[in-house]
Amino acid sequence: MEFSHKAIEKKWKKYWEENNTNKTTNTSDKKSYVLDMFPYPSGAGIHVGHVKGYTATDVFSRYKRMNGYDVLHPMGWDAFGLPAEQYALKTGNDPIDFTLENIKTFKRQLKMMGFSYDFDKEISTANPNYYKITQWIFNQLYKKGLAENRDVEVNWCQELGTVLANDEIIEKDGLMVSERGEHPVTKRKMRQWVLKITEYADRLLEGLDELEWNSSIKDLQRNWIGKSTGVELDFLVNNIKVPVFTTRIDTIYGVSYIVLAPEHEQVLNITTPEQLKEVQTYIELAKNKSEIDRKDESKPKTGVFTGSYATNPHTNELVQVWVSDYVLANYGTGAVMAVPAHDKRDWEFATKFNLEKKFVIENKTDEKAFVGEGKIINSDILNGMDKKQAIQTMTKIAIEQGWGREQTNYKLRDWLFSRQRFYGEPFPVLYGPNQEITLIEDLPVELPRIKNIKPSGTGESPLANVEEWVNVEIDGVKYRRETNTMPQSAGSSWYYLAYILADGENEFIDIDSAEAKKRFEKWMPVDLYVGGQEHAVGHLLYARFWNYVLYDLGITSVKEPFKQLFNQGMILGPDGRKMSKSWGNVINPDDIVSTHGADSLRLYEMFMGPLDASLPWSEDGLDSALKWIHRAYRMVMTTELTDVNDTKLDFVYNDVVKNVSEMIESLKFNTAISQLMIFVNAVYKHEGPVYRPYIEGFVKMLSIYAPFIGEELWEKLGHAPSITKQAWPVFDPSKLVSNTVVIALQINGKLRATIEVEKGTIKDKLLELAKKQESIISYIKDKEIIKEIAVVDRIVNIVIK
């Protein structure tokens, strides 16, 4: 007995749509907020990689609904961004219209897959009603002193006509290029908006301890924040004070030189005339190097001597001052005291330029840098001390003598928050005649609809060309609008709250209203957040920062927005490589749904392996999923049902319900499917009618993976839709004691097969069953049986000649 997946999908999509089946309920005291990282609506539509994460959250959401939870499972669009703007520049199309068309495609595909999103909660970051709240949040940040307009060194891409964030840049041949298009990127000073995320560094660090996140993601954030405590020391160079930050003041006797970053403000001031040209050339070369390249410890060290010497503030010894790009201006003071005997990078640098190496920690070799623990040596008053004691002693001396102070530093930089683009949220900011800043409270400030969105050529955004929009007169005073726009990460930093505020498609209640507070208390935090690991130190950090600020303002009810985070693995191409148009290995879900059906695709991707594993696409695996769904369908449709339980399936059914429930809770979706297969196999082996509640319970469990076939089978079993409104099956612990045993079947003492029988099956019956097994028949056919041994509940052994 077969079925047409196309007919079933059409039928149930229509039913769900007409009956608003997926609408969020508010009837339970239990809630589950299940969230996908929302996509950028590109022209390509969703791919099978999207399907993996989205299916996982859909399975989990359906499971929670059937367990009596109010479930918020929404979807929206990270709609602003450079790709739409670049497409518009190439084609002459409006990026807003282009994005809206892409959203239609995405939405069609998501419905095609049977995902149970509540599209009454749909959002788009590019909708004015949405970015009205983004602008409101910016105003609160400004009022709290967390938003500032200042001159900063930025990553400038001339080809794209905009500033790029570090996570929008890649390294190619040691140089910085844009991730999109691989255009050259250079450093330049520009006036930009920045958000002072550094003021929340400690809280963001401490908050990680509360979270049910993968430890690797938490470590990425800890390292990105990069908190370190130490001492800031003053080295004198030609009477110019050069502060140096160190966490190892105990090694001060081992300093052989100091190194300044090429961008350090004092480099040219301390360089001798003889070295000036060489230093200037080096600085220019360093400007085009990526930070990734400069941090790469495998790359050969480069540098140049300034010609000057610094005075060690404790020993008064003169040491050379060098400039090298392995020192970064944006960490610490942009200057380091080099102790090559006990630092790998300093050792390589000193070796290359033939600089002195002084060992000040006891060790057994002088052929490489010793970075381990040991007693202090060659250090006068510190000799014999351990690291902790020596640090305490030297810190006290530095503070008392006035050339040092305790300092805490962070690698985390303030968030560069403006872009020279058209397609982004406008800032709600006006500049007066004397450049004084006035916030616009009447929101939203909407983007103008214009055809010419080409870069201004001046470093300003294309909005600078729209004079009628830029220039504003209020009460006779002329103002000029801020022409930069916010980065794409602005809208994604609070979108998890937007779903809660949504009242119909892109309609929102006020974020600071009493109703909003009530809703936040109901739904926050997000209980399960699924998305890619690539967002670990961008979006996830920014969203946590904004949530902390909104918590401080009394808007949100919790400090941390995402309780549990899970990073799904990738779906690789059949060749094992990452799917890419250039490789020609991209799999389009539209094609798969057409040939195999949405349920088969969902089931296959969940059964491939653990959710966090990256695995290659397999057509054979997809075919197997389709065959199994048909096998399950036939089982339900052809099995004779009874309301009288013969108890023979008690153990297997209750064991499967227990295991599937536990596995779904722990996101082990693949092993839960294996349990469903066990039940199907057991029913096919069962003789006689099957207890109806067990078949119905199976269909409920199947439906969270395969919702189309689940609905169809539920209806054919005589029930009114929708199966999503049914209660999840409950196992009976008293029936988890098996009434069957597995009997080993041996030929001449060697295991040849096994059979499952009821406990206590008598010897003669065991022998009869054993001789009916095909694998045993092949051994005993035309052979003389010398002896037959049968042990109840254990073994059958047939001895042949």
Swiss-Prot record:
ATP binds at K581. It is an enzyme of class 6 (ligase). Keywords: Aminoacyl-tRNA synthetase, ATP-binding, Cytoplasm, Ligase, Nucleotide-binding, Protein biosynthesis. A motif ('HIGH' region) lies at residues 39-50. It catalyses: tRNA(Leu) + L-leucine + ATP = L-leucyl-tRNA(Leu) + AMP + diphosphate. It is found in: Cytoplasm. Its EC number is 6.1.1.4. A motif ('KMSKS' region) lies at residues 578-582. InterPro entries: aa-tRNA-synth_I_CS, aa-tRNA-synth_Ia, Leu-tRNA-ligase, Leu_tRNA-synth_edit, M/V/L/I-tRNA-synth_anticd-bd, Rossmann-like_a/b/a_fold, tRNAsynth_Ia_anticodon-bd, Val/Leu/Ile-tRNA-synth_edit. GO terms for biological process: leucyl-tRNA aminoacylation. GO terms for cellular component: cytosol. GO terms for molecular function: aminoacyl-tRNA deacylase activity; ATP binding; leucine-tRNA ligase activity. Belongs to the class-I aminoacyl-tRNA synthetase family. PANTHER family: LEUCINE--TRNA LIGASE, MITOCHONDRIAL, LEUCYL-TRNA SYNTHETASE. This is Leucine--tRNA ligase. It comes from Mesoplasma florum (strain ATCC 33453 / NBRC 100688 / NCTC 11704 / L1).
